[in-house]
Amino acid sequence: MAYKLKQSGDYRKRRNFSMIKNSLELDNLLQIQKESYQWFAQEGIKEVFDELGHIESFSGNLTLELGDYEFDTPRYSIKECKDRQITYASPLKVQTRLFNNETGEVKEQEIFLGDMPLMTESGTFIINGAERVIVSQLVRSPSVYYSKELDKNGKPVFASKVIPTRGTWLEYETDAKDVIYVRIDRTRKVPMTTLLRAFGLSSDEDILNMFDNDKFLKNTIEKDSTKNTDEALIEIYEKLRPGEPTTLDSSKNQLITRFFDNFRYDLAKVGRYKFNRRLNITDRLLNMTLAQDIVVDGETVFTDGTKITKEVLEELKKYLEAGYGKEEVKINEELDTHNVVQVLYVYSPLDPKKKVKIMGNDQDIDVRTLTISDVYASVSYYLNLLEGIGHDDEIDHLGNRRIRQVGELLQNQLKIGISRMERVVRER
């Protein structure tokens, strides 16, 4: 029988007896592992140092920076490591700079940070003389997810989860009395309006103006015991840390640490991409009917009542991407500075005479922490779902999953190690 010789990897050739040509080339799985580790060694470590390698003392007098790094030659070969039952690794040396912020003095020194295990040509690691492999993980992508269930009366009930790569989760839910609650890091729930007050919408009027007098938020306000931003901050602190003494400063610092601190909260690049894609107002516009004129440079390009088909949406995207509908909104600037959202009005599918406000986040944001713009947009999407606008997610769909390869897994472990080192350095 006729066959063709086909290269498989760097060293082997395989006989292929297939009569039909494969439409897809098989990936070199070994090369994927090796390229991922190479990315970690060349770029992943640098990203961690750029993100976390700026350590300041509690007094603010001294600042330590982690700069360039290099790998020294491994002490032993792969065979020697197996024979001696030790780890095949290379010393990682880092150039550090210590700044004295009072005198302006700068000291530079190369330090030994640790032994970094090296990947062999086979895509494995030698750990204590034994050959080991890091298995890629299939995980849920960081994003904003919305789910729908039917209660015992057949009424749709929505829930939402705001999930980062690392950090505190937010979960939205609605009870039988149409009151919206939020759970912060899966703890006891608080009314949604309490969180909105903490993020800058201090009064009832601020909340209702922002979300267009939404009836669900009106119900929630009635259950909310707080009346302004300061009370909301303290209420959230007491829910998350019951029994601890409460001050306004500690309440603010807690929210900053949980959501707006690079050390504690990280969306990663994929998370920011998914957040911006999900919270973009274009995700909710298809098959809706415009409830406003779209006027650009004094010219009406779309009129009130226009049905948003695929063709209309593609044209509308051009104006939205150019900044149409962007507004600055009220936020708690002590927590965050991102105060831009994008707004458009459509008619409700459930009540064709009712105008509904669609609010998206700032698509120009490229930070890896949560922003108040993200929170407002995620709440708006949740309220839109209750009006029949938008769509829920199938959480187990592979489109909502991603693969964490060896390079990213190692980078995450390095982040944990640098964060621990940062605490020790500050204390000393």
Language-model segments: what does each one mean?
Residues 1-428:
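N-terminal non-catalytic structural scaffold regions of very large proteins
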